[in-house]
């Protein structure tokens, strides 16, 4: 399901600092609105992430999590976050089996990520069958997607090779998260707020019904 990497360190860094470092080196990163006292920060790449990633402060350092049905943009952000944050806090990186990871980009190279994405897609199809075709709910960055037989048939991916089908599915999931339900507008009723680090309120991106 989810993949967790632990950054073992006694040092800490402010949320704003590590997000600015990630954004400055990698790509435009948008952080979901969280309370300053909240130990978990959830964020993704604007218009690209499907599920985003989570960084949680723990007693031993930091936990960096990526969830099932993440896409390539999520995985790329996850790898860069682990690399950048581990340098900022001088951390050693370990997987869930307490095995040390020397190079996250080597440990989770593009080929392995492709395998995980295809595996997740196949797993969702198995879960749908186990639920007799009834939709399964998976949360994206902003809203829940309901995935069932009707959707798979609607996307016309039933008979496609798994990798191709997974790519089409993730594009649909991306459209659901961003194109349809995210609008740039002031004075709206919002359930969740995103803002680019350093941007003013006028650049915020709002989710609303």
Residue ranges and their predicted role:
Residues 1, 40, 86-89:
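A short, compositionally biased
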Residues 1-10, 61-65:
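Short glycine-/aliphatic-rich beta-strand segments at the starts of folded cytosolic domains
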Residues 9-31, 77-87:
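Amphipathic alpha-helical segments
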Residues 10-12, 67-73, 87, 186, ...:
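Short, flexible beta-strand-to-coil junctions
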Residues 23-74:
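Short, intrinsically disordered low-complexity segments
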Residues 93-117:
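Short, highly charged C-terminal tails/helix-capping segments
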Residues 108-209:
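Aromatic/basic-lined ligand-recognition segments
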């Amino acid at each position: 399901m989810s993949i967790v990497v632990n950054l073992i360190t006694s040092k800490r860094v402010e949320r704003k600092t590590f997000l600015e470092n990630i954004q400055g080196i990698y790509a435009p990163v948008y952080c979901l609105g969280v309370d300053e006292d909240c130990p978990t920060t959830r964020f993704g790449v604007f218009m690209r992430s499907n599920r985003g990633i989570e960084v949680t402060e723990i007693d031993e350092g930091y936990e960096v999590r990526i969830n099932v049905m993440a896409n390539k943009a999520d995985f790329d952000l996850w790898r860069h976050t682990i690399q950048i944050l581990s340098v900022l806090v001088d951390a050693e990186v370990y997987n869930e089996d307490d095995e040390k990871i020397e190079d996250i980009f080597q440990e989770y190279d593009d080929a392995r990520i492709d395998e995980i994405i295809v595996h997740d897609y196949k797993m969702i199809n198995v879960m749908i069958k186990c639920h007799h075709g009834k939709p399964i709910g998976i949360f994206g960055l902003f809203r829940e997607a309901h995935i069932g037989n009707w959707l798979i048939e609607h996307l016309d991916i039933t008979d496609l090779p798994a990798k191709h089908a997974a790519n089409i599915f993730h594009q649909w999931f991306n459209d659901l998260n961003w194109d349809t339900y995210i609008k740039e507008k002031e004075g709206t009723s919002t359930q969740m707020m995103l803002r680019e680090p350093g941007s003013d309120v006028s650049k915020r991106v709002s989710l609303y019904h």
